[in-house]
Amino acid sequence: DTLTGSLGATSATYVTDTQYLQWGTVAAMLFGTHPGKSSMVTWMRDPGTQRLTGMDLHRQVTPGVTDEDTSINYDPAGNITQVKATLPGGQVDNQCFSYDHQQQLTESWTPNTATCDPGTRNQSALGGPAPYWTSWATNTIGKTTSRTDRTPTKASTTSYSYPGDGASSSRPHFVTGTNTTGDDPGTASYTADDAGNTTNRPAPGGGDQELVWDELNQLTEVTKSGGSVAKMVYDASGTRVLRQQGDTTTLYVAGNEIALNTTTSVVSANRYYGH
């Protein structure tokens, strides 16, 4: 099972070979045909549940070396509790996850060990290439009430505001505001239309953005201080066909993105394949 593409007079095979398990799930894929530069990704699954339990990446340019060895662990309810990636040289990116009785994520962190012991979870004991520790608090009906973000050197807590609960409440699960304390303090507010679409939100760099939606609840424009930040156009099926943002206009057609820089007249493109 291969995937081949062409551009002009040249063609290339992107997926050289695909191997499947007896259940029809993909077990391995071989990429590329250039001598000595192909790579293979292998996926491991639990035979009873078919849950993904691991992934290995091997490249021909590094024979005998596993470029990435990822393992995935679950709790009895099927929630992911650990994703551990071991990289060349022994560097480990270990992400751990804990859940409450409602099976909502409450803790996500990267310890400086290969295990996920909640008893050793500490801001000073974070590790990996991008160390972090995030905690979420929820109320009895499942709304997130606060989030605490930590790195080895910083910490901040964000609390969330909602409309009132009850049958007469409008959009009771829509976040209307946030208040952040700690190393990155700040406040933010949000509004929504009757369909629940966000109509106002904080803008990057300060100020607010207004979001405009059509009758099909598709985002058509983002504005700031009366000026357009981005515009989107859709076809009759609801698929986005055009996006204008800044000096770039992007056309989406037949699995391709064709972008024109209206200032420099430079055209770039991305092509996407399904396999």
What does each of the following model-derived ranges do?
Residues D1-L3, S98-R121, T191-V233:
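Surface-exposed extracellular loop regions of Gram-negative outer-membrane beta-barrel proteins
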Residues D1-S6, V26-M29, L52-M55, I80-V83, ...:
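Beta-strand-dense domains in secreted/periplasmic systems and polymorphic toxin scaffolds
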Residues G8-A12, N112-A130, G166-S168, D183-T187:
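Surface-exposed intrinsically disordered loops and tails
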Residues A12-Y14, G36-M40, T66-E68, G90-D93, ...:
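Short, small/polar residue-rich loop motifs at catalytic or cofactor-binding pockets
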Residues H34, Q60, L87-G90, P152-T153:
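Short glycine/acidic-enriched loop and turn motifs that connect beta-strands
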Residues P131-T178, G206, L211-H275:
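Short secondary-structure transition motifs
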